[in-house]
Amino acid sequence: GCHVTKHPDGKMHPLGAIASQLASAYANNQNQNENLVKMGWLDRAPDAKTPKSWKDEAASTQDRAQAYLNIHCGHCHNPDGAADTSALILDGSHNAAINRGVCKTPVAAGGGAGDMLYSIVPGAPDRSILLYRMESSEPDEMMPELGRSLIHSEGIALIKQWIREMPGSCPN
Protein backbone atom coordinates (compact mmCIF):
# COMPACT_ATOMS: atom_id res chain seq x y z
CA GLY A 1 0.00 0.00 0.00
CA CYS A 2 1.05 3.57 0.53
CA HIS A 3 3.51 2.43 3.18
CA VAL A 4 5.76 1.19 0.35
CA THR A 5 8.94 3.26 0.07
CA LYS A 6 10.20 1.98 -3.28
CA HIS A 7 8.58 4.58 -5.53
CA PRO A 8 10.19 5.43 -8.90
CA ASP A 9 11.80 8.58 -7.47
CA GLY A 10 12.68 6.93 -4.15
CA LYS A 11 10.44 9.23 -2.09
CA MET A 12 7.18 8.83 -0.26
CA HIS A 13 4.30 10.90 -1.59
CA PRO A 14 1.46 12.01 0.69
CA LEU A 15 -2.14 11.33 -0.15
CA GLY A 16 -3.82 14.50 -1.27
CA ALA A 17 -5.99 16.17 -3.85
CA ILE A 18 -4.97 16.05 -7.50
CA ALA A 19 -5.60 18.72 -10.14
CA SER A 20 -8.67 17.05 -11.66
CA GLN A 21 -10.33 16.84 -8.24
CA LEU A 22 -9.91 20.61 -7.83
CA ALA A 23 -11.08 21.49 -11.34
CA SER A 24 -14.67 22.04 -10.30
CA ALA A 25 -16.58 24.85 -8.64
CA TYR A 26 -16.87 24.87 -4.89
CA ALA A 27 -18.65 27.18 -2.43
CA ASN A 28 -17.49 30.32 -4.28
CA ASN A 29 -18.54 28.91 -7.69
CA GLN A 30 -14.96 29.12 -8.99
CA ASN A 31 -12.69 26.42 -10.38
CA GLN A 32 -10.53 25.65 -7.35
CA ASN A 33 -7.29 25.45 -9.37
CA GLU A 34 -7.93 28.97 -10.72
CA ASN A 35 -8.84 30.14 -7.23
CA LEU A 36 -5.49 28.82 -5.90
CA VAL A 37 -3.70 30.85 -8.61
CA LYS A 38 -5.60 34.01 -7.60
CA MET A 39 -4.63 33.40 -3.98
CA GLY A 40 -0.96 33.02 -4.98
CA TRP A 41 -0.68 29.38 -3.94
CA LEU A 42 -0.09 28.17 -7.51
CA ASP A 43 1.84 29.86 -10.32
CA ARG A 44 -0.59 28.59 -12.94
CA ALA A 45 -3.65 26.38 -13.07
CA PRO A 46 -2.78 22.83 -14.16
CA ASP A 47 -4.49 21.34 -17.19
CA ALA A 48 -7.32 19.29 -15.77
CA LYS A 49 -10.79 18.29 -16.90
CA THR A 50 -13.65 18.76 -14.49
CA PRO A 51 -14.22 15.27 -13.14
CA LYS A 52 -17.48 13.40 -13.13
CA SER A 53 -18.91 12.66 -9.72
CA TRP A 54 -19.53 9.04 -8.79
CA LYS A 55 -22.78 10.23 -7.18
CA ASP A 56 -24.08 12.01 -10.33
CA GLU A 57 -27.07 9.90 -11.39
CA ALA A 58 -27.19 11.78 -14.72
CA ALA A 59 -23.70 10.53 -15.65
CA SER A 60 -23.16 7.14 -17.26
CA THR A 61 -22.38 4.13 -15.08
CA GLN A 62 -18.96 4.00 -16.80
CA ASP A 63 -18.16 7.63 -15.89
CA ARG A 64 -19.42 7.20 -12.35
CA ALA A 65 -17.40 4.01 -11.81
CA GLN A 66 -14.25 5.60 -13.22
CA ALA A 67 -14.73 8.60 -10.93
CA TYR A 68 -15.21 6.31 -7.92
CA LEU A 69 -12.11 4.25 -8.70
CA ASN A 70 -10.06 7.40 -9.33
CA ILE A 71 -10.90 8.98 -5.99
CA HIS A 72 -10.70 5.79 -3.91
CA CYS A 73 -7.96 3.81 -5.69
CA GLY A 74 -6.06 6.15 -8.01
CA HIS A 75 -3.73 7.49 -5.29
CA CYS A 76 -1.92 4.11 -5.24
CA HIS A 77 -3.04 2.58 -8.55
CA ASN A 78 -1.28 5.00 -10.91
CA PRO A 79 1.95 4.78 -12.94
CA ASP A 80 3.99 6.35 -10.11
CA GLY A 81 2.00 5.06 -7.14
CA ALA A 82 2.68 2.44 -4.52
CA ALA A 83 0.65 -0.13 -6.49
CA ASP A 84 2.36 0.58 -9.82
CA THR A 85 3.68 -3.00 -9.94
CA SER A 86 0.11 -4.33 -10.09
CA ALA A 87 -0.32 -2.87 -13.61
CA LEU A 88 -3.84 -1.89 -12.52
CA ILE A 89 -4.11 1.83 -13.33
CA LEU A 90 -7.23 3.36 -11.77
CA ASP A 91 -6.42 7.08 -11.72
CA GLY A 92 -8.03 7.76 -15.11
CA SER A 93 -4.71 8.29 -16.91
CA HIS A 94 -4.98 5.15 -19.07
CA ASN A 95 -8.01 4.28 -21.17
CA ALA A 96 -7.07 0.77 -22.28
CA ALA A 97 -9.46 -1.75 -20.73
CA ILE A 98 -6.58 -4.01 -19.62
CA ASN A 99 -5.02 -1.12 -17.65
CA ARG A 100 -8.33 -0.69 -15.85
CA GLY A 101 -8.36 -4.41 -15.02
CA VAL A 102 -10.60 -5.90 -17.70
CA CYS A 103 -9.40 -9.47 -18.31
CA LYS A 104 -6.12 -8.63 -16.53
CA THR A 105 -4.52 -11.42 -14.56
CA PRO A 106 -3.25 -10.40 -11.13
CA VAL A 107 0.44 -9.59 -10.78
CA ALA A 108 0.78 -8.94 -7.06
CA ALA A 109 -2.55 -9.81 -5.40
CA GLY A 110 -1.33 -12.93 -3.61
CA GLY A 111 -4.11 -14.41 -1.47
CA GLY A 112 -6.13 -11.29 -2.21
CA ALA A 113 -7.14 -12.77 -5.57
CA GLY A 114 -9.67 -15.07 -3.90
CA ASP A 115 -8.87 -17.89 -6.36
CA MET A 116 -10.17 -15.74 -9.22
CA LEU A 117 -8.44 -15.34 -12.59
CA TYR A 118 -9.01 -11.69 -13.55
CA SER A 119 -9.25 -8.27 -11.93
CA ILE A 120 -12.50 -7.64 -13.83
CA VAL A 121 -14.58 -10.18 -15.74
CA PRO A 122 -17.11 -8.32 -17.95
CA GLY A 123 -20.67 -9.17 -16.95
CA ALA A 124 -19.51 -11.14 -13.89
CA PRO A 125 -18.88 -9.05 -10.77
CA ASP A 126 -18.87 -12.21 -8.63
CA ARG A 127 -15.83 -13.47 -10.59
CA SER A 128 -13.90 -10.16 -10.43
CA ILE A 129 -10.94 -9.70 -8.08
CA LEU A 130 -11.51 -5.93 -7.90
CA LEU A 131 -14.93 -6.38 -6.34
CA TYR A 132 -13.77 -9.27 -4.15
CA ARG A 133 -11.13 -6.99 -2.60
CA MET A 134 -13.56 -4.10 -2.20
CA GLU A 135 -15.98 -6.40 -0.35
CA SER A 136 -13.33 -7.96 1.90
CA SER A 137 -12.68 -6.77 5.44
CA GLU A 138 -9.52 -8.91 5.81
CA PRO A 139 -6.48 -6.62 6.25
CA ASP A 140 -4.34 -8.53 3.73
CA GLU A 141 -7.10 -8.57 1.09
CA MET A 142 -9.21 -5.41 1.46
CA MET A 143 -8.96 -2.47 -0.87
CA PRO A 144 -8.39 0.32 -0.43
CA GLU A 145 -6.10 -0.66 2.38
CA LEU A 146 -5.79 2.85 3.78
CA GLY A 147 -8.50 5.03 5.23
CA ARG A 148 -11.07 2.27 5.39
CA SER A 149 -12.59 0.32 8.23
CA LEU A 150 -16.05 -0.22 6.73
CA ILE A 151 -17.18 -1.78 3.48
CA HIS A 152 -18.68 0.98 1.31
CA SER A 153 -21.99 -0.48 0.14
CA GLU A 154 -22.81 2.40 -2.25
CA GLY A 155 -19.45 2.08 -3.99
CA ILE A 156 -19.76 -1.69 -4.20
CA ALA A 157 -23.24 -1.41 -5.73
CA LEU A 158 -21.90 1.02 -8.35
CA ILE A 159 -18.89 -1.14 -9.28
CA LYS A 160 -21.11 -4.25 -9.43
CA GLN A 161 -23.47 -2.45 -11.82
CA TRP A 162 -20.54 -1.21 -13.95
CA ILE A 163 -19.03 -4.70 -14.26
CA ARG A 164 -22.45 -6.28 -14.89
CA GLU A 165 -23.09 -3.80 -17.76
CA MET A 166 -19.68 -4.41 -19.40
CA PRO A 167 -19.81 -6.18 -22.75
CA GLY A 168 -17.41 -8.96 -23.66
CA SER A 169 -15.81 -11.89 -21.89
CA CYS A 170 -12.40 -13.14 -20.76
CA PRO A 171 -10.61 -16.33 -21.84
CA ASN A 172 -11.23 -19.21 -19.46
Please provide the spans of the model-predicted regions.
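Short sequence/structural segments immediately N-terminal
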Residues: G1-M12, A65-N70
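A short alpha->loop->secondary-structure connector
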Residues: P8-A23
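Electron-transfer interface patches adjacent to heme c in soluble/periplasmic c-type cytochromes
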Residues: A23-Q66, H75-G81, I89-P171
